Curated annotation (Swiss-Prot):
Designated name of the protein: E3 ubiquitin-protein ligase SINAT2
Keyword Transferase: yes
InterPro entries per the UniProt record, alphabetical: 7-in-absentia-prot_TRAF-dom, E3_ubiquitin-ligase_SINA, Sina-like_RING, TRAF-like, Znf_RING, Znf_RING/FYVE/PHD, Znf_SIAH
PROSITE patterns: ZF_RING_2, ZF_SIAH
Domain notes: The RING-type zinc finger domain is essential for ubiquitin ligase activity.
Result of knocking out the encoding gene: No visible phenotype, may be due to the existence of 4 homologous proteins.
GO function terms (MF aspect): transferase activity; zinc ion binding
Induction pattern: Induced by drought stress, salt stress, osmotic shock and abscisic acid (ABA).
């Protein structure tokens, strides 16, 4: 959400009624600590399923993650990772001795000989890596969990796509629609007073995949603008298989945007700041709205298609 903005309820106008509705503020309480589902995003600490005691030796007793150099030890041989050494204020959490700066070089050397699976193996990654290459791979693994794409508030929930779809529907109360075309009217009674705002996103089920439609108001330099854009619930390589168009207009004039939906791997803010979408200056948006230009009534139409 843009700094200082508010989450606004998007209004979708039915072609059969021709009625406009005022945008409502979305007040949704979200449990950001909601556990992920087993077998989807609920996974083990580091994806190692082995009875080998070496792996247990490499587990930090404080954070329970695998340890990477420098691995520290106290005079009695108890080990812990470098991050936790700072957290425990240089005191061994096992025996309470002062840690000092003793490295456990033997354990670091043993780790070099190990091959371990990706921590996301139960999400589909079955590759095996040298111990010290595993962490770098996991930062970019295509099977790693996605972050919730909701833009109306900060949400820390992660998971696979099916888990996030349920989360968006149940926890954020996001509207879900089937189809590859859309026709929305965004309404706001006091657009001149709203410099930063994020409307409630809508999720479309299209070609068996999910797409998030965003709409918001923010300042582009000194100019107030509105922006609409689409994000794909999947990886960037999959997103490139699709294209979409957005259009606004009235009085014989129109603005059209065509592009490729961005993956939700890219944050909402990153996409907005890159201006990768349909940008409508506020004066033009109010012109398209008609009337005395004191109320936003902006119709955004669009469609999604699959590239052959």
């Amino acid at each position: 959400m843009a700094p200082g903005g508010s989450a606004l309820k998007e209004v979708m106008e039915s072609n059969s009624t021709g009625m406009d509705y005022e945008v409502k503020t979305a007040k949704v309480e979200v449990n950001n600590n909601k556990p992920t589902k087993p077998g989807s995003a609920g996974i083990g600490k580091y994806g190692i399923h082995s009875n080998n005691g070496v792996y247990e030796l490499l587990e930090c007793p404080v954070c329970t993650n695998l340890m990477y150099p420098p691995i520290h030890q106290c005079p009695n041989g108890h080990t812990l990772c470098s991050n936790c050494k700072l957290r425990v204020q240089n005191t061994c959490p096992t025996c309470r001795y002062e840690l000092g700066n003793i490295r456990c070089l033997a354990l670091e050397k043993v780790a070099e000989s190990l091959e371990v699976p990706c921590r996301y193996q139960n999400l589909g990654c079955h590759d095996i890596f040298p111990y010290y290459s595993k962490l770098k791979h996991e930062q970019h693994c295509r099977f790693r969990p996605y972050t919730c794409p909701y833009a109306g508030s900060e949400c820390s929930v992660t998971g696979d796509i099916p888990t996030l779809v349920v989360h968006l529907k149940d926890d954020h109360k996001v509207d879900m629609h089937d189809g590859c075309t859309f026709n929305h009217r965004y309404v706001k009674s006091n657009p001149h007073e709203v410099e930063n705002a994020t409307w409630m996103l809508t999720v479309f089920n299209c070609f068996g995949r999910q797409f998030c439609l965003h709409f918001e108001a923010f300042q582009l330099g000194m100019a107030p603008v509105y922006m609409a854009f689409l994000r794909f619930m999947g990886d960037e390589n999959e997103a490139k298989k699709f294209s979409y168009s957005l259009e606004v207009g009235a009085h014989g004039r129109k603005l059209t945007w065509q592009g490729i939906p961005r993956s939700i791997r890219d944050s909402h803010r990153k996409v907005r700041d890159s201006q990768d979408g349909l940008i409508i200056p506020r004066n033009l948006a109010l012109y398209f709205s008609g009337g005395d230009r004191q109320e936003l009534k902006l119709r955004v139409t669009g469609r999604i298609w699959k590239e052959e």
